[in-house]
Amino acid sequence: MLFDVFQQYPTAMPVLATVGGLIIGSFLNVVIWRYPIMLRQQMAEFHGEMSSAQSKISLALPRSHCPHCQQTIRIRDNIPLFSWLMLKGRCRDCQAKISKRYPLVELLTALAFLLASLVWPESGWGLAVMILSAWLIAASVIDLDHQWLPDVFTQGVLWTGLIAAWAQQSPLTLQDAVTGVLVGFITFYSLRWIAGIVLRKEALGMGDVLLFAALGGWVGALSLPNVALIASCCGLIYAVITKRGSTTLPFGPCLSLGGIATLYLQALF
């Protein structure tokens, strides 16, 4: 089968994973930019604030274009990472700067896929971790931009983990994965409720609760404290570096780092 080919050619999997990561990262950039716009349009349409004559945006249409000059991006200018480097981070037509976030998301996804292929070679679990990485990267960037974790991403994390356990590709049994989800939800929801009473404000978003619960289906109930500890440390470091102080902190990226770090710690130790 396919894994037999990877055994015969051991470098094939890392190379394929890296290239696939660049391509998926390019698609994630589209999702990160367009999905919040799509939801705002749906809300405007629901409230009657958007006419049928106004153009709607989707993940497929319109084609990728420069947000400054509206020129459609040529195929040769849409190669993940390399096009940004060749164009020196500027639009070919209007010379407007292209955000560094685009190549960073592509590079981060490629590195995440590469690392998973090296730690879990010839494994369905390695593929599952790649999918998890894609969900978490998209969710984290959207949370950084909008301080909001869309349900579609937290549900993606949840169901990918449960399906991997059901297919016996996960280190966890399906029962352990479900237990991890339930423990994660009860723990963080209780913490959210208590913090709301004590602080008299929302200390944890519901998206954070759902993401923590979903990660429980990947790491198991016993490793959830590790996720919370790493996430809290990351949040503290982020707050100090950005000097956010008492302002709202997007906790989704911290939970994502905590979940991924815990998975690799479980594999390596």
From Swiss-Prot:
Membrane topology: Multi-pass membrane protein
Protein localization: Cell inner membrane
GO molecular function: aspartic-type endopeptidase activity; endopeptidase activity
Transmembrane segments: 15-37, 102-121, 125-142, 177-199, 219-241, 248-267
Periplasmic compartment residues: 1-14, 122-124, 200-218, 268-269
InterPro entries associated with the record: Peptidase_A24A_bac, Prepilin_IV_endopep_pep, Prepilin_pept_A24_N, Prepilin_peptidase/N-MTase
UniProt keyword Transmembrane helix present: yes
Pfam family, one: Peptidase_A24
GO biological process: signal peptide processing
Cytoplasmic face residues: 38-101, 143-176, 242-247
Keyword annotations of the record: Cell inner membrane, Cell membrane, Membrane, Transmembrane, Transmembrane helix
GO CC terms, sorted: plasma membrane
Chain's role: A pre-pilin peptidase involved in a type II secretion system (T2SS, formerly general secretion pathway, GSP) for the export of folded proteins across the outer membrane.
Note: In many other E.coli strains this gene is part of a type II secretion system, but in MG1655 the locus is missing a number of genes.
Entry's family note: Belongs to the peptidase A24 family.
Name assigned to this protein: Prepilin peptidase PppA
Species this protein is from: Escherichia coli (strain K12)
